[in-house]
């Protein structure tokens, strides 16, 4: 939610990135601030749409290309299961690359997003993250759940977002190729 909705939260994550994977950190003042702000932001989004009657939601950021990737890693691979956070993290990076390719997100902000994702190990490249076919199938399924509209939330800056309705398969392929490390 930091990338899409709160530059303040993103800044806190960046400043404290060394400690983010240490569970003890969340007892500290900065750790508590990160948790409190995350909860507040999520509740703000859910408050006005508790029954999900509005299908254009920024909280879908990270949940467009990743659902099938995550499920296939369990069902088809079984060897290297992709945890939810890593699947979502990769989805966020791919979506941010798409936004940058379209000229909405600056290269500087894309770099910040990618660097933070890499630092906290949310950018592991499982072979399923390199499959445009699997990711596009996931996106097609999510589009159905969004009333037949893509409603793809993209960051236009850190903490600012918009939606696109016309993503093409070739754009996803390009973003995936740019994400392979």
Language-model segments: which ranges?
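Carboxylate- and glycine-rich phosphate/diphosphate-binding segment that chelates Mg2+/Mn2+
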Residues: 1-59
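Short glycine/serine- and small hydrophobic-enriched flexible loop segments
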Residues: 71-74, 93-101
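A short glycine/serine-rich beta->alpha loop
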Residues: 51-54, 76-83
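Small-residue-rich helix-loop
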Residues: 86-94
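C-terminal charged capping/lid subdomain of soluble metabolic enzymes
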Residues: 104-181
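Residue-level signal for inorganic ion chemistry
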Residues: 63, 92, 158
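Alpha-helical transmembrane segments of multipass membrane proteins
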Residues: 44-45, 68, 98
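Active-site His/Glu-centered metal-binding helix of metallohydrolases
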Residues: 61, 65-69
């Amino acid at each position: 939610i930091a990338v899409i909705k709160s530059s303040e939260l993103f800044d806190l994550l960046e400043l404290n990135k060394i400690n983010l994977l240490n569970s003890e950190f969340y007892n500290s003042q900065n750790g508590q601030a990160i948790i409190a702000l995350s909860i507040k932001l999520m509740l703000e989004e859910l408050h006005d749409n508790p029954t999900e009657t509005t299908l254009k939601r920024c909280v879908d950021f990270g949940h467009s290309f990743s659902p099938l990737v995550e499920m296939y890693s369990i069902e088809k691979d079984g060897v290297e299961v992709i945890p939810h956070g890593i699947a979502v993290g990769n989805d966020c990076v791919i979506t941010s690359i798409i936004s940058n390719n379209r000229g909405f997100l600056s290269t500087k902000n894309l770099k910040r997003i990618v660097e933070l994702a890499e630092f906290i190990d949310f950018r592991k490249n499982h072979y399923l993250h390199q499959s445009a076919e699997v990711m596009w199938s996931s996106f097609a399924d999510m589009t159905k759940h969004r009333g037949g509209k893509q409603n793809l939330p993209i960051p236009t800056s850190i903490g600012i977002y918009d939606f696109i309705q016309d993503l093409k398969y070739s754009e996803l392929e390009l973003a995936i190729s740019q994400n392979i490390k």
